[in-house]
Amino acid sequence: MTFRAKPVVRRFQRPSWDTRNRRNFYLNLGFGLAVVAAVVILGIAVAISYYNDHLAPVGSVDGQSITKDDLRDRTAIETWRLQIAQRRVNTQAAAGQLTQAQAELQTQQVDQARQQVIPNSLEKIIDNRIQAKLASDEGVAVTDSDVDAKLLEEATTPESRHAWQIEVKPATDPGATEPTAEQKAAARATIEKALADIKGGKAWDDVARTVSTDSATAAQAGDLGWVTKDDAQTDEAFLTALFAAAVNTPTDVVEGKDGTFRIGRVSEIVAQSVDGNYQETLTNDGIDLGKYRAVVRGDVIRNKLEDKLVADASKAAPQRQTDEIYLSQATIDLPDDAVKVRHILFSPKDDPAAASNGDIPADDPSWGQAKLDADAAYVRLKNDISQFDALARSESDEESARGPDGTGGVLDAYVSSDSSYVESFSKPILDAKPTDGQLLPPIKTEFGYHIVQVLNHPPDLAALKTKIDSGQADFEDVAKDFSEGAEASHGGDLGWIAKGQLQKEMTDAIFAAPVGKTSAVVTIPDDGQYLFLVKDEQERTPEGRQLDAIRTRLFSDWYQPKKDAAAVERDESIVAGLAG
């Protein structure tokens, strides 16, 4: 038997370091993955944050988003434009080209625009996108040269002139709203003599202070301050004469649309100027020139669309000479008890302010005298109510009622159960349930004693039309008595009206009416009611302010329905957040 030694088999054993490495490897891998995940999450968070801060939509037009950055860029541009406007106000005020009141008004307008700059900027982006599509559809193109020209226009300060006036307003009889032919002739003769005196060597200042009937400027020798060609406050014909005049050379006599006669003079001219550093200022103030040019391009697109629309309207076409009666929505909505009145006030010591403030004791004899005066006036007017206007203009202690330019005691607002008049005045009137034309006995209030005549209850425009059409009433008289339009005192005279000049519903009514007849009553929601009298028709070419009005109205009437039809969305909450 052979004995062999049993072979020894040695088992392989992993070294201890291998186990540790594997564990470390997985730990490191897990840590790495965690880091990667954290980076990814952070990246996502950053991306979301960036999106929310920059790319989140604040609105859209036909599915095309308007991002926060779009709105910020446009807001920055519009804010810069307002800054430039304010700088110009400050410069002109410092140069004496604006009065303090004018500068304050323009500054207030700039401040108001600043308060709405974000929502207004969003609306401008919306308009630009819609109008760009419309321009493409209409074949309207804008070149770089067009943009350059618009930038030059923005950089240009227009010519301004230091203007002076002497005006003579024709006198009118008490209660009348229009002068007679003799009164107009007398006014013309007065101002023509003034012009002759100036040309003969008499000092302008002396003539202005003694002849001009404009109480606001006569004491300052007729100083109107600085005006530009686009001054909408100055009579158009007179403004044209001022810009045609040489320095210190009086204009001819100009009869204004308001019937007032004027002579003008220009003492100084500041020529049109161009800011050669305009674009440099823009970029120095942090505005991207490329983005600014894109905004200007949008402005030019709108102008070109307007030009295309107004091209036909600016040609000679039938126009209609028109009078208007207008009743505001507030008047239409008045309660049934409302009445229009005029009054004559007799105050103790002729001082309504002191009376109402309690500065005149109730037992002061002047209260008794005021009552005696009121009682005497009441008796006088009961015998002859036609004296009311003259008495109000000469004896009323209400300052606004007195004189040829006063109200004659006619109150602007109706007296009603919800009017703002003191109860001591309104309650006795309403309790009397008066009829039109009725004269009421003296009414005591904290201001004194009032003689009140009820003029009318709220008018029904359809009923007034019936009276006019049947010959029972004259259109111009009704306009003077009832209309709330700007031309009411002139019988509602609107002058010549072209198609496209007024709101479409009004224009349609005017051109549908036969010459010499009234139109249908036109109701404009939230505005009021209109009735027109067509007096004449002529072929005329629109120009000046009439053409400007046509341009604005035509574009609005054409564009607004198209904007309403577009798919426009606005995220008001985001816009409000940006504004806050």
Segment roles from a protein language model:
Residues H54-Q92, D337:
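Short extracytoplasmic
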